[in-house]
Every structure is written in structure tokens, then in C-alpha cells.
């Protein structure tokens, strides 16, 4: 029921936004009476209710694909096919990404965009309806963050909005875009760079919440982030025969991580930062000449994100000085 309520909410937000739009000849006047808007809200709720099976099928189907970022091929094929059947025009491989797409309907202002994520996370395979860890395939990826549900909600809301626009001759444009590789901080930045939001008046998105709760308008619960890979370069040597001849890039990685962890106590409570060592060398008896650590720096706004990023850069530079690496 909460998923259906969210579909209604998103659709109604779009209707309210569309209300003051300048319209074409023969379309509804720019300012609708409150009673007319109330009628549209009730009609939207009824249409969403009729699409419960359609919505649930999308949720389950995307869950079954469970594709990692930039590899959402089956998910993309399924979702774009569903949108084309509903009368949307689909442009594929947008912004230079094979699994990215943009579906559109209508013309003119306002331009309302729907966006939500579609990728999954590693090692999160899980049988549906089971309240304990029980993977479908051991160590396989899965939708551990609920990205199988958001696009179903957005598409349902967009389909209902399209039907009401057609029936009531409401002008405007609907856009639907997928959050490709959101877990890797992927598509949205590339969409912006490609200019896909230049004509957009507002973007509406949704994401499943903890315990299937529904909330909105709480920016303090959400953060932006910068993804950074720090690659250190040292000098290889035999770790037993002549370690003094080497300069360990892995030592630099470990010192950077140690420095960052000591600094955590003195960072804002709102920040989140995490890392993995994505390259720690080849084998223990060789001093690693190359090593890489991958960081995410999260904060509530850009200035604070930038502060974390610049602090990370200082930690990396200090690590190179201590280890005579670059």
C-alpha cells in the first residue's frame, strides 16, 4: 500500500506543477480551479490503483535481473519496452552510456523529469520474501538497496500523468531517466554534462526507505558525495632479499587510511566516509610498486563535500612524503 501511496504522491506533485503551465490552443486554461485539481487528484489515485499489478510486476522483474552499475542491460531492455508500450518515445544509449536512456511524452512547458536508480550492489543476492540472508546465487549481486522498486513507482506515476494529460488536454512534457550505476556515482553527473536537464523545470525522484517508510522533503536525510581513487606509485623490490631498495605504495595507502581514521573524531557528525583498497599489490614477497585506495566522501552540501575531498588530498600527499612515493 505504501508503494501505491508513493505513486499517487509523485503523480499529484507533477499535476500541481503542471497546473500553471502555459497551454496550447484547445488545452486547459493556465490556472485551473481548485475543484478541478481536486478532481484530477482523485482520478489519479484511481488510475494508480488500477495499475497495482503492472507496478508489482515491474518491481519483481527488475529484482530478478539484479544487474550491477553500467551493466543494467536486461533491466534497460525491459523498462524501455514497457514505456514504449505505454506510448513513450525512448532514446537509448544517452550521455555516452549503453544502459542509459530517456523516455519522453508531450511537448512544451512545464518539463517534468522523473529519475530513480536501477542498479544493484555486489554480493547481495537474496530470495524475495525471506527475512534472513538466503541468496538465490551465493556471492551474486542483488538489490540490497531497493533499486528494483523506484523505477516501477516512477513509471506508474508517469503513465498515470500521461493519461490525465491526454484526457484533460493538459500541456507539458514528461521525461523519465534511469539512475544508471548510482552505486558508483554514475549517470546523473553524465546526464547533466550532456545537457539532458537544461529544459527541465523540476525533477521528481523516489527511493525506498528503511522499513518501507514513506517520507519526503527531508534534505537532512540525504547527502551528496565525491568518489575518488588515490593511486600511489613506489618502487618494486624483493621483500626478503632487498626490501630497503623498494618504496611501498601499499605503505602509502595504509598510512593515508590510518590518518583518515584518526581524523574521523574531528569531522562533522553529518559526514560519512568509507574506503576499500582496490589494489594492494601482487604478492607478499614483492614490495608493491602500485597501490590504490578508493574513497567516498559524503556530506549534506557541496562546500562540506569539497572540504572532505581537499582533506583527503592532504592525507594522500602526507602519505607520499612519509613513504617516498608519489
Regions found by a protein language model. Give the residues of each.
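Structural recognition of the beta-strand scaffold that forms the well-ordered cores
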Residues: 61, 91, 111-115, 175-178, ...
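Signal peptide processing junction and immediate N-terminal pro/mature segment
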Residues: 19-27
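A conserved active-site cap/scaffold subdomain adjacent to cofactor or substrate pockets
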Residues: 286-312
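Histidine/acidic-residue-rich, glycine-tolerant segments that coordinate divalent metal ions
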Residues: 133-142, 148-149, 165-288, 298
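Acidic/His- and Gly-rich active-site-bordering loop/insert found
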Residues: 26-143, 152-172
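Bacterial N-terminal signal peptides
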Residues: 7-16
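Positively charged n-region of N-terminal signal peptides that target proteins for export
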Residues: 1-4
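A common structural junction motif
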Residues: 118-121, 263-264, 313-323
